[in-house]
C-alpha cells in the first residue's frame, strides 16, 4: 500500500514537472520576442521618430474608442436616478404666450372704482340738469360755457370717479374673450390738452385708470400744449403724483395738436399708441377690442365706437344691447370729415358686433395704432400746423399705403362734441387750408382740383406755392409704393359721388339785376329754399357747378342740386348719382344765350326778385332773370 502511494506521487510529480517545463519554455520564448521587438522599436525610434508619433496617435485613437465603448455600455444600463431637464433658451425677440383666453382676473383694471352714490349729480352716466341756479351760479355757468364751449359748471359738479351704470353693450361684446396667443400688446394712452377744464381732463384720466387692464396700460402721457391756466401747472403736477403711470410732458409754446401728439408718441414706451381727447369717458371693456385687433393685424388702425356725451348735461349716450345702426367716417370735397350710415355690403360682411367696420376715413381724435407701424407709415405730417386736415391725410395715407382703418363696435368711448372750438388759431384759420393743400398735393392726384375749386384760400396757397416742402411726404409715398387716389375711390369709397373733374362752369351765380349772388344759406342740408346774398367770392355757400348732365350742383358737403318747383326754388338731394341713375326734370337747367336759367320741365326761368329766388314766366328783358355764372377769383 505504501509502495502504491509512492508510485502515485512520483507520477504526479513527473506530470507537473513536464507542465512547468512547457510553461517555462513559452514564457522564455515570449521574453525573447519582447526583447527583439524592443530592440527593433529602439532602432526604428532612433531612425524614424515621426513614425513613433503616428503610432502614438493611433494608440490614442484606440484608447478613445475604448472609452467610448465603455460609456456606451454605461449609458445602456438602466438609470436609477432621473436628471433635471435642460431649459431651452427662447430666441431673442420671441414673446412667449400661453394658450387659451385671458381671464377676468388677468384683465383687472389699474384701479378699482370707489363706491358710488346713485343720487350724485350725473351718477351712472345720467344727465345733470342745471336749473334753478342762483345769480352767481348762473354767471359761473356762462363763464364756463364761454371759455370751454360746454357746460363746465355741470362737469365740475359731477364726480371725477363716476361710473356709467350697467354694461349695456350687446351680449357678444360682453362675453367676448381674447386669446393669450398672440398676447395683447401694451399701450401708451396719449392725451393732449390746451387750457382744458380741470374736471373733464381728470375725469378722462380716472376713466382710463378704472377701465383699462393693468397688464395692458403701460402709461398715460398728458401732453400740455402750452396751457396758460394756472391750475394746469403745479396743481396738476401735484395731483398726478399719486399715479405712478401718469406722466406730463409740456410744450413751452403752442404748436397745436399735431406736434403735441408727435411729442407724446416720441416719449411713449409701449407697443401701441392710443390717442384720446381730453374730454372723454371710457366705457367697460373699451381697450381690449382695440388691442386685440392690432395683435391680429399689425396694419390695422382702429377707433372705438364714439358715443356722445351731451355738452350741456354730460349725459353719456350708452350703447344699445341690441346693437345699433352704426356710422362710418367719410369726407366731402371740401375735405371735411363727416359721418354716414353703413352701406349694405358692409352690413352683410359683418356677422356680429365683434366684427370691425371698414371706414373710408376716421375722426382722428380717438384711435389705437402699433407704435412701430405709426412710425413706418409716416406718423403725422410734421409740417402741418396746429390742427385740421391731419385725420383726412392719415386716412388716405393708411388706405393707399397698404393699411386699413376700422371701427370696433365693442369698444365704446364717450366724447363731448362741441359745436365750435374754444381755441384760437395763432396764425388764423389759414393754417387749416394750408394743411389741406399739403394732403391734397400728395395724396389726391388730379382730384385735388375738385377741392381747389371749392376753397379759394386753398387755391391761392397753391398759386403762391405757400404750402411748404413736400419732399419728405412724397418720399414716404414712393418708399411704401402707395396706390393712387383713383384706386382709393374705386376700392375703398366707391359710394362717393365724384364731381366732374372739368365741369362746364364752376364758381358763383350772380344776378345781373342786383349785386347779389345765389346762396344756399346757413345749415342748408337740403329741403330749404335758397337765398340771395351779398357776393363774397370765397366759394363755400356760394359755390356752384354746372355739370355735364345740365345740373346746377352745390355738392360740397352733400350732393345737393337746384330743384325747380312752383314758387321758391329749393336745394335738394341730386337725383343723378352716377352708377346708372338719371337726372329728373326738376333738376335740369339750360343756360340760354340771353343769360336766362331755364327749366324745361316746368318751362319757367329763375328770378332774383325777392329774398329767395323763384321760378317765373320767362322774360328776356327782365334783368332779375339774367345771371352771370363765373369762376371765383
From Swiss-Prot:
- What reaction does this catalyse? L-seryl-[protein] + UDP-N-acetyl-alpha-D-galactosamine = a 3-O-[N-acetyl-alpha-D-galactosaminyl]-L-seryl-[protein] + UDP + H(+); L-threonyl-[protein] + UDP-N-acetyl-alpha-D-galactosamine = a 3-O-[N-acetyl-alpha-D-galactosaminyl]-L-threonyl-[protein] + UDP + H(+)
- Protein residues bound to UDP-N-acetyl-alpha-D-galactosamine: 519, 522, 536, 541
Any signal peptide, and if so, which residues? none
* Tissue specificity remark: Expressed in organs that contain secretory epithelial glands. Highly expressed in pancreas, skin, kidney and testis. Weakly expressed in prostate, ovary, intestine and colon. Also expressed in placenta and lung and fetal lung and fetal kidney.
Topology check: give the Cytoplasmic ranges: 1-19
User: Which disorder does the record name?
Assistant: Tumoral calcinosis, hyperphosphatemic, familial, 1: A form of hyperphosphatemic tumoral calcinosis, a rare autosomal recessive metabolic disorder that manifests with hyperphosphatemia and massive calcium deposits in the skin and subcutaneous tissues. Some patients have recurrent, transient, painful swellings of the long bones associated with the radiographic findings of periosteal reaction and cortical hyperostosis and absence of skin involvement.
Protein's UniProt name: Polypeptide N-acetylgalactosaminyltransferase 3
Specify the taxonomic lineage: Eukaryota, Metazoa, Chordata, Craniata, Vertebrata
Amino acid at each position: 500500500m505504501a509502495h502504491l502511494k509512492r508510485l502515485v506521487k512520483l507520477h504526479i510529480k513527473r506530470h507537473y514537472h513536464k507542465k512547468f517545463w512547457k510553461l517555462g519554455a513559452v514564457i522564455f520564448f515570449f521574453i525573447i520576442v519582447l526583447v527583439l521587438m524592443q530592440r527593433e522599436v529602439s532602432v526604428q525610434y532612433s531612425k524614424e521618430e515621426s513614425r513613433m508619433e503616428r503610432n502614438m496617435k493611433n494608440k490614442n485613437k484606440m484608447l478613445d474608442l475604448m472609452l467610448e465603448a465603455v460609456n456606451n455600455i454605461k449609458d445602456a444600463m438602466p438609470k436609477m436616478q432621473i436628471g433635471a431637464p435642460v431649459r431651452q433658451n427662447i430666441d431673442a425677440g420671441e414673446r412667449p404666450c400661453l394658450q387659451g383666453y385671458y381671464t377676468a382676473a388677468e384683465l383687472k383694471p389699474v384701479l378699482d372704482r370707489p363706491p358710488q352714490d346713485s343720487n350724485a349729480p350725473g351718477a351712472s352716466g345720467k344727465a345733470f340738469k342745471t336749473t334753478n341756479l342762483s345769480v352767481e351760479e348762473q354767471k359761473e355757468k356762462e363763464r364756463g360755457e364761454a371759455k370751454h364751449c360746454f357746460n363746465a359748471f355741470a362737469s365740475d359738479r359731477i364726480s371725477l370717479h363716476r361710473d356709467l351704470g350697467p354694461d349695456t353693450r350687446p351680449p357678444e361684446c360682453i362675453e367676448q374673450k381674447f386669446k393669450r396667443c398672440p398676447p395683447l400688446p401694451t399701450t401708451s394712452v396719449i392725451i393732449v390738452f390746451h387750457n382744458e377744464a380741470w374736471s373733464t381732463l381728470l375725469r378722462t384720466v380716472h376713466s382710463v385708470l378704472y377701465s383699462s387692464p393693468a397688464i395692458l396700460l403701460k402709461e398715460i402721457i398728458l401732453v400740455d400744449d402750452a396751457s396758460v391756466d394756472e391750475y394746469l401747472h403745479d396743481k396738476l403736477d401735484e395731483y398726478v403724483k399719486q399715479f405712478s403711470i401718469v406722466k406730463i410732458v409740456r410744450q413751452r409754446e403752442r404748436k397745436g395738436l399735431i406736434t403735441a401728439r408727435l411729442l407724446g408718441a416720441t416719449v411713449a414706451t409701449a407697443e401701441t399708441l392710443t390717442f384720446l381727447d381730453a374730454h372723454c369717458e371710457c366705457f367697460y371693456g373699451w381697450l381690449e377690442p382695440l388691442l386685440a385687433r392690432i395683435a391680429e393685424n399689425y396694419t390695422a388702425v382702429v377707433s372705438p365706437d364714439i358715443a356722445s356725451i351731451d355738452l350741456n348735461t354730460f349725459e353719456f349716450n350708452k350703447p344699445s344691447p341690441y346693437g345699433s345702426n352704426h356710422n362710418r367716417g367719410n369726407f366731402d370735397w371740401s375735405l371735411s370729415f363727416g359721418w354716414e350710415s353703413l352701406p349694405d355690403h358692409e352690413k352683410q360682411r359683418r356677422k356680429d358686433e365683434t366684427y370691425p367696420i371698414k371706414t373710408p376715413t376716421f375722426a382722428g381724435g380717438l384711435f389705437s395704432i402699433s407704435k412701430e407701424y405709426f412710425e413706418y407709415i409716416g406718423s403725422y405730417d410734421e409740417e402741418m400746423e396746429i390742427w385740421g386736415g391731419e385725420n383726412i391725410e392719415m386716412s388716405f395715407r393708411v388706405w393707399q399705403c397698404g393699411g386699413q382703418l376700422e371701427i370696433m363696435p365693442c369698444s365704446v368711448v364717450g366724447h363731448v362734441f362741441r359745436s365750435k372750438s374754444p381755441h384760437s388759431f395763432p396764425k388764423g384759420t389759414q393754417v387749416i387750408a394750408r394743411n389741406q393743400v399739403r394732403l391734397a398735393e400728395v395724396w389726391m392726384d388730379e382730384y385735388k382740383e375738385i377741392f381747389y375749386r371749392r376753397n379759394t384760400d386753398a387755391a391761392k396757397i397753391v398759386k403762391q406755392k405757400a404750402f411748404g416742402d413736400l419732399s419728405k411726404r412724397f418720399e414716404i409715398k414712393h418708399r411704401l409704393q402707395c396706390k393712387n387716389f383713383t384706386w382709393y375711390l374705386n376700392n375703398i369709397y366707391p359710394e362717393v359721388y365724384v364731381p366732374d373733374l372739368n365741369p362746364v362752369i364752376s364758381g358763383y351765380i350772380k344776378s345781373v339785376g342786383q349785386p347779389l349772388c345765389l346762396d344756399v344759406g346757413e345749415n342748408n342740408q337740403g329741403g330749404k329754399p335758397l337765398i340771395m346774398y351779398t357776393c363774397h367770392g370765397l366759394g363755400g355757400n356760394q359755390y356752384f357747378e354746372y355739370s355735364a348732365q345740365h345740373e346746377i350742383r352745390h355738392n360740397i358737403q352733400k350732393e345737393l342740386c337746384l330743384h325747380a318747383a312752383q314758387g321758391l326754388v329749393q336745394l335738394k338731394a341730386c337725383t343723378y348719382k352716377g352708377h346708372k341713375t338719371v337726372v329728373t326734370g326738376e333738376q335740369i337747367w339750360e343756360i340760354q344765350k340771353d343769360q336766362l336759367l331755364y327749366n324745361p320741365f316746368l318751362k319757367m326761368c329763375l328770378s332774383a326778385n325777392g329774398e329767395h329766388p323763384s321760378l317765373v314766366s320767362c322774360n328776356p328783358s327782365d334783368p332779375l332773370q339774367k345771371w352771370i355764372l363765373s369762376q371765383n377769383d
